[in-house]
């Protein structure tokens, strides 16, 4: 098999390479006191979550997809580059919170760790109790006053949702700014990987300013050159606008649709209510089909032009098709809301007309199958406690172009 060219220009081109993160020690940091702050709706059974994720990864491999695990990429980058170690430590150690004396001691300790151990700390965090025994307590008021179980480095339990912290658009990768404090440092790890891992040598960036929040779950590649960006709880209007201008400047898109969505937990990203399942077909939460609008942003000779229309109409026009087909799940309103909450609309396309979905959303899956979509199901009773489905848990690095 030859070297796969990295890049994606659609949601449904045959998936060749994907980044996943097998949940690990970072989930063990969740407890009843911090679960809300760390953006989970419950305490997952970690061993079962790992089993479910292994099933997901194996399904992708069985379909010819190369699965890259984020923890492996991080360890390899830290092994390959001393600069990567410096970058990772600098992003993890916050002198403003820890004070200069403790920050200096902690940084020196982390830089001396073996790559695999450092990678683990960068992902799972560290408590004050886990500091080395010879850490000087006499010079740090912060160390003396903190409870031993407090985090000196916060864990990153949402790493499993690799979709959000890097976005491939064409041959370039976007390392976005994540909106919430619990997730901000995730992007520092993907930034490190793309900067220092040999697999990504020469990969160019898009949206390099990263000044306003954009998250990958809000970004849908509707067709080559056409990008939809959800604007709601996570991605801001300023982020959508800045991303659009960056994509225009780099000739990565000719049209960007900014799609307002409700600012609520159940609809945190655009891909929680709408994903593509074929080149001209979406599955969409029934309660938003008629309500979604879009601001079409296009580059013109005189600058940038913005117009507003219903989302489905704007999308079809931008894609150059008569109509964007919406699979009617036809569900009872209560069942529709239940299955949307359980990520029933958050499917991952492996190729046109073939998707991965959580098995628990039986009614949505049945309607997809009746519409001619092949649905490959995985368990998600524990993975779903962080409110994310197969699309959320995957970052496509290479798809066949459409």
UniProtKB/Swiss-Prot annotation:
Organism ancestry: Bacteria, Bacillati, Actinomycetota, Actinomycetes, Mycobacteriales
Q: Which GO terms describe its cellular component?
A: cytoplasm
Q: A GO BP term, please?
A: arginine catabolic process to ornithine
Record's InterPro entries?
Arg_deiminase
Active site, renumbered? 392 (amidino-cysteine intermediate)
Q: What is its EC number?
A: 3.5.3.6
Q: What is its main location?
A: cytoplasm
Q: Which organism does this record belong to?
A: Mycobacterium avium (strain 104)
Q: Where in the cell is it found?
A: Cytoplasm
* Keywords (A to Z) from UniProt: Arginine metabolism, Cytoplasm, Hydrolase
The catalytic activity, as recorded, is: L-arginine + H2O = L-citrulline + NH4(+)
**Recorded GO MF terms:** arginine deiminase activity
Q: Note whether Cytoplasm occurs among the keywords.
A: yes
> Pfam families given for it?
ADI
For this entry, the protein name equals Arginine deiminase
This protein's pathway reads: Amino-acid degradation; L-arginine degradation via ADI pathway; carbamoyl phosphate from L-arginine: step 1/2
- Whichever gene encodes this chain, its name is arcA
Which family would the database say this protein is a member of? Belongs to the arginine deiminase family.
